[in-house]
Amino acid sequence: MKRIMLFLATNLAVVLVLSVVLNIVYATTGMQPGSLSGLLVMAAVFGFGGALISLMMSKGMALRSVGGMVIESPRNETEHWLLETVGRQAQQAGIGMPTVAIYDSADINAFATGAKRDDSLVAVSTGLLHNMTRDEAEAVLAHEVSHIANGDMVTMTLMQGVVNTFVIFLSRFIANIVASNDDEEGQGTNMMVYFGVSMVLELVFGFLASFITMWYSRHREFHADAGAARLVGKEKMIAALERLKMSQESKLDGTMMAFGINGKQSLTELLMSHPPLDKRIAALRNQ
């Protein structure tokens, strides 16, 4: 219940901040909210603003959502190995030392997040540490470090911002046309039509846009696998992916799943954030 309230409060705060920003833009430019340019600006503020704020808050939100414990001073050999391995890989990849955390989950997974290459987070599940060999775990860590080095978090955020902007703009633009052509029974009826149509269209366009974002997410995974292979060798990366084939489906949600080592299954590959493991293994073998 506490997490739900925190989630709702955070989203409300984001909406309020973006509303203030939007009003400042309208006031300083003299732009009319009801104009086409005003609609586009509103779509961009909420489309990009929400994505960028989520990225800036991603480290703290990710740690809270999984109950992650940051390793500051290693208490045992495993934690010491984690810090040493991530530090070495980060140096090889040319990025700053990420914050390293462990979270309690039987799920064999890890994820990376953060707004900057030199201020990021790598989190590893206890399930991964208990069920993978050191070589396999090293490859998974290299995969996450590669995500950071490739700037995938920022690129994915920018893509999501563009997609959000077009979804909001097209939905409101079409809804305005439909509401204007509706029987003129009063302003209230038209506003109800406007909001009803825009909500439905946002759902439809959002679903269609997910094909684009999921395609890019799968594309990123191949690059992160290749980056990991360069850091630790492709045989270790292949062994890690083979191990994942024996594990359960990922329990991570949202952005954390997108930047995890393993994703969720879907009715169609087009809606998967990660390519099938067999395709990832084949791509590594063909390098």
Curated annotation (Swiss-Prot):
Binds 1 zinc ion per subunit. Disulfide bonds: none annotated. InterPro entries: HtpX_protease, Pept_M48_protease_HtpX, Peptidase_M48. PANTHER family: PROTEASE HTPX. The chain crosses the membrane at residues 4-24, 36-56, 158-178, 192-212. Its EC number is 3.4.24.-. The keyword Cell inner membrane applies. Its main location: membrane. The keyword Cell inner membrane applies. Keywords: Cell inner membrane, Cell membrane, Hydrolase, Membrane, Metal-binding, Metalloprotease, Protease, Transmembrane, Transmembrane helix, Zinc. It comes from the Bacteria. Belongs to the peptidase M48B family. The active site is at E144. Zn(2+) binds at H143, H147, E221. This is Protease HtpX. Its cofactor is Zn(2+). GO terms for molecular function: metalloendopeptidase activity; zinc ion binding. It is found in: Cell inner membrane. One of its GO terms (biological process) is proteolysis. NCBIfam families: PRK05457.1.
